[in-house]
Amino acid sequence: MIDPMLTIIIPTHNRAEILGRCLEHLSEQTFQDFQVIVVDDGSSDKTQEISTSWSFRFPHFKYVYQKNQGQGNARNNGLKHATGDIILFIGDDILLERTAVQGHMLMHKKHPEKRIAVLGLVLWHPEVEVTDFMRWLTSGKDGGTQFAYDLLEGKEEADYNFFYTSNISIKKKLLEKHKFDQDFHSYGWEDIELGYRLAKEENMKLYYNKNAVGYHHHMIDEKSLADRMRSIGKSSKIFHKKHPELKKLPPLWKKTALWLISRKPVLMLAKKYRKNFYYYALSKRYLLCGLRQV
């Protein structure tokens, strides 16, 4: 059997139900010449059962189990089994539009050189009730911390800060020397850090294809912000140690400013009158906590 052109790698942990829907959407793609690799990062639910039940829908399918070591390690593990010349990373809660994979492949056909990566668009799934908090999360101009696709409006290229592994494809040759750094154990920065290394050392060029759409089927509430931002804070210190030239950590004056805007009186006023600023200030309160934890 001839190896497929593309390998799709999906790291997952205890989300069997949505993983099944993710695989269902892959089975409906207009472009089908791909290998699917599900990397189970130590799940205790029915992830293996769901994966096996869908494996018969794909000529090239592999289920890989590992002890819980995080998404970056899971993606690296998936790469060991990848046979395609192009790698597409997606999240287990990303439901791709029928033409999304084709959109990635057309862009790679247009730009066949080895140093190319393609960023697809991620939107909230129509079934998900999008709250004010979730809208802020995906608003780059308001300091949201999930995605910042609004900053790419009208653009065809993006820099390493947009190396989002929820929906991104890349030539496998680019990843022969560069893997996800396993020093990142908490949420945040491990994908951006890889993107930076690829841009710096391999001159990676990241194209943006807004027509390669994936829908994020994941309800996120405000209660998760504390853990999310503390993790980002811890990871940002690791990032800074590796790449101090980027100055990703806020200087003392900015830490002081962030501390001031995240005091309770300011938060109370912002919550009442300026919701996006409230979420931004609250996120910085937890970020500062994370910076102190490392």
Which positions does each model-derived feature cover?
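N-proximal low-complexity "stem/linker" segments adjacent to membrane-targeting elements
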Residues: 1-27
